[in-house]
């Protein structure tokens, strides 16, 4: 009997041991961990540096308008000071010969012909007189009006472009005044007859002269300058159209007391670059529409 009880006890202990081992081998039941996500936070607000911020383009307005390099239009018409003193004898001309014969002091030359080409004069390049001569240039003679005072050259047309004085040589000025005083050129057109291109001569020139007035004229190229003046005093260039000159509008060298008012400058320069509205050298008291002429270079 004791043996039987001992056997039963042994079997019970063995069953318990086996039951414990089986439990150890089984994976314990676990609860699946919940998936977590990072908390969504707003991106920090940043300030863009001023150098990176998009800016709107700004417009700069100059206190004093600066003219374009090759053209300029006066803000208002100029007012000329008269240069003619005393009486004049009026002479109407229609040919180059008549024009040359009329050159004298105290004279008003009124141009009636649509065109006077100085190269058609009978004594072109060879004739001369007390008040004019011809200077030989590279490609032809240049007319020089000399030693006269109180002289007017005026076109008789309704507009300045109705009457034209011209010259063929491209190295010659169309009309030059030398050692003259009280000269008035008005209401007329001056320019070279040949098509635009390279020229070494300009349109209207004053040398060693004083009290000259160029008013209401059309001065065109291919001349290098519309008006050139050297060693002269008291000149006025008023209310003209100066255009298509290869170097520029007006040029003054060793001059004093010059006014350039109310003019329009257009198409100055050539294929190599724009021209100057005004150029001065060794001058005193040069103004353009009341401003210092040197600022318009």
Walk through the language-model features, giving the residues of each.
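Positively charged n-region of N-terminal signal peptides that target proteins for export
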Residues: 1-8
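Hydrophobic core
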Residues: 9, 13-17, 51
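Sec-dependent signal peptide cleavage junction
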Residues: 17-34
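Acidic Gly/Asp/Thr-rich repetitive segments characteristic of extracellular carbohydrate-active
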Residues: 70-127
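Detector for repetitive beta-architecture
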Residues: 90, 96, 106-108, 113-115, ...
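Extracellular beta-strand-rich solenoid/capping regions of secreted or surface-exposed proteins
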Residues: 100-105, 117-154, 164-186, 192-209
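Feature marks extracellular polysaccharide-active and adherence modules
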Residues: 112, 146, 154-156, 178, ...
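Short glycine/acidic-rich loop motifs that flank beta-strands on beta-rich extracellular proteins
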Residues: 120-121, 164-174, 193-202, 223-230, ...
């Amino acid at each position: 009997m004791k043996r039987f009880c001992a056997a039963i006890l042994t079997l019970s202990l063995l069953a318990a041991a086996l039951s414990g081992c089986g439990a150890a081998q089984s994976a314990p039941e676990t609860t699946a961990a919940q998936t977590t996500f990072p908390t969504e936070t707003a991106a920090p607000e940043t300030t863009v540096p001023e150098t990176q911020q998009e800016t709107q383009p700004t417009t700069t307005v100059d206190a004093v308008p600066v003219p374009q390099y090759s053209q300029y239009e006066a803000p208002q018409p100029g007012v000329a000071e008269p240069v003619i003193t005393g009486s004049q004898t009026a002479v109407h001309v229609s040919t180059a010969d008549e024009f040359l014969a009329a050159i004298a002091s105290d004279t008003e030359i009124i141009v009636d012909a649509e065109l006077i080409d100085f190269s058609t004069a009978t004594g072109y390049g060879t004739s001369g007189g007390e008040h004019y001569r011809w200077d030989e240039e590279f490609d032809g003679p240049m007319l020089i009006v000399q030693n006269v005072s109180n002289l007017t050259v005026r076109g008789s047309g309704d507009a300045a472009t109705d009457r034209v004085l011209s010259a063929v040589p491209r190295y010659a000025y169309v009309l030059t005044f030398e050692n003259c005083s009280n000269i008035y050129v008005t209401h007329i057109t001056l320019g070279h007859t040949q098509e635009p291109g390279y020229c070494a001569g300009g349109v209207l020139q004053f040398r060693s002269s004083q009290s000259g007035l160029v008013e209401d004229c059309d001065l065109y190229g291919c001349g290098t300058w519309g008006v050139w003046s050297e060693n002269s005093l008291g000149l006025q260039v008023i209310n003209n159209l100066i255009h298509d000159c290869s170097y520029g509008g007006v040029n003054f060298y060793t001059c004093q007391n010059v006014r350039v008012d109310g003019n329009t400058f257009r198409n100055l320069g050539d294929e190599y670059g724009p021209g100057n509205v005004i150029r001065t050298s060794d001058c005193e008291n040069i103004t353009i529409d009341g401003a210092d002429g040197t600022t318009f270079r």
